[in-house]
Amino acid sequence: MINQLINWQELSPQQKNSALARPAIADSALLSTQVANILSQVKNQGDKAILALTEQFDGIALSTLSVSSAQVAQAKLALTDKRLKAIHTAYKQIKSFHSAQTASDITVETTPGVKCTLKTEAIESVGLYIPAGSAPLPSTVLMLGVPAQLTGCQRTVLVCPPDKNGQLADEILVAADLCGITEIYTVGGAQAIAALAYGTETIPAVNKVFGPGNRYVTEAKTQLSQQVAGFAIDMPAGPSEVLVIADGQANPAFIAADLLSQAEHGVDSQVILLSDSESLISKVSTEIAQQLTLLSRCKIAEQALKQSRLILTKDLAQAVEVSNEYGPEHLIIQTEDAPTLLSKLRNAGSIFVGAYTPESAGDYASGTNHVLPTYGYSKVISSLSLADFSRRFTVQEITKAGLQSLAECIIELTDAEGLDAHQRAVTIRLEEGS
């Protein structure tokens, strides 16, 4: 269970840092070496290594890596109407919100004869990594696939570990089809990321890879982003987390449910409650104990709760300060004066306002993206959006008159920096025909 209540007012600066400390991410030299070995095998042996590693780690001997269009068609027939409707509804919701993010080119004439343009273009090829654990994750397919589709990436490749029969879940294939993804491969783990970075006989390399994964996948993404020229990753990955700010009028059952919904993700997940009401905190603690027994993943949630926090603050203003310092992945506000708090909150991956806005809605169907910065990265990294699937570059066009108007400035600054060739690139143009 969660450790006893923490009174923020009574903590020293060092104790406050400890109270907000996140679970340590294992940094193993052995892991690094193991992943480096996998990457080397894929780089040098291509498909042969992929098939061998899949048999080694997934226990399945595959004859092919590609998923056929016939398999996708069969998946549509295999799912119930109810399951299909849910996937389509989530797709529609996510597409609706993300469609509004489409960027337009910006052109400014900074001075007469000097035109500057900011252009946005889709990344040409992207890879989407979809984990496969105890259940399929079609929501992750949609959260990654919809932005890629709307941005207009020329190639979108999906990789996912095969099940014990060498297949991908029907939900994965249906969600991928909705997003217009036709390149689908049954490969997972570090070897999948290596295939996307280096390319193999079957899987062409991509420019950028997206998606969560275990520590082998995370390590592979990190190593490859540093080794392969032009290969990028989405964002640093860490354990899932949620922070709730609540006042005395909040519903303790709702709060407990929200905290447990994150705790069940993994034993390294962290959940935090900040409140100015000791009575509410006590009620939430009781609710957690009661609801925990109802969960199929209660053992996992129970482990996560050991590194979680129930914090009593002087007032809600102090709760906001603590939240901004922590910078949670998910931030839930359940207070009567939520708009006032919202205006002061700066660091969060995604914010959920009001009693009827569970974090689960954002995970699946509200329309926002559930790929969010964790481990405090919300202070510097944004939630996933169309911007992550595109890149921007500038274009400038200058007339002779425009260059003449800038010449004095450029000549003086190049003189200050001692860059004669830069200066001459300007003067030679103005001397011509003068």
Curated annotation (Swiss-Prot):
Binding site for NAD(+): Y129, Q191, N214
EC number of this enzyme: 1.1.1.23
Pfam families, alphabetized: Histidinol_dh (PF00815)
Active-site residues annotated for this sequence: E329, H330
Assigned keywords, A-Z: Amino-acid biosynthesis, Histidine biosynthesis, Metal-binding, NAD, Oxidoreductase, Zinc
InterPro entries: Ald_DH/histidinol_DH, Histidinol_DH_CS, Histidinol_DH_monofunct, Hstdl_DH
Disulphides: none
Keyword Ion transport applies: no
GO cellular component: cytosol
Gene Ontology process terms (BP): L-histidine biosynthetic process
Coiled-coil spans in chain: none
Listed name of the protein: Histidinol dehydrogenase
